[in-house]
């Protein structure tokens, strides 16, 4: 995988240097217990095991969970702030370079995968790029600070809301690279005002709902994501936009869309393209990215 290789080549040197520094511990600045957890995992016969470094830097979701089970939590406290600072430093070095700033764009993430409402633009020359959330918080698992599949390009609102939520112990949030809302999770409006359904009033509340056949694990993660990231609150800021969508749904019937397709056959490939044009969005799951 090209992206994996590029990511590993970019960060491995700084990671290897830090591991050597931690092992030497010349100034005795690291907490012995935490230091030994790092050394015991990464070193074999007094040498760094590169396969384990590769696993930490480019391993997938399941691989990272395995690493966490072996190394465990390295809590940041006054006795071992230095170890966390070292991992924080190599992470900051990554985000301060063009490779790190453009990583989200390179892997094709243009909209925050947590809320799916905020664009995350990457224009390094103008000082604009996404923030990176650590799905497994670096405050507890600092050795995953530069793990490719632990870095979630996201918007500042979601990054701040999630903060140091421990997604390993309580499995609280959807993992954006592998899990999704899809067609099984949807938004619904709640209102006593009938005009809302015609898009003529925005006096309603937006709620996240799930189909009856959705697995309980997914349903719980969706509820947790909504609570922790304030998804419903954020979407209720856009009632006016939702009203316009409802009005469009009422006005632009299937018959109307078919008439557009028949009248302008050279403009639209099929009915899906007509509806995408009317709603200014892709309604087909395979095009969501």
Describe the predicted segments one by one.
Residues 88-101, 133-140:
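Short Cys/His-rich Zn2+-coordinating modules
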Residues 151-152, 162:
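A conserved active-site cap/scaffold subdomain adjacent to cofactor or substrate pockets
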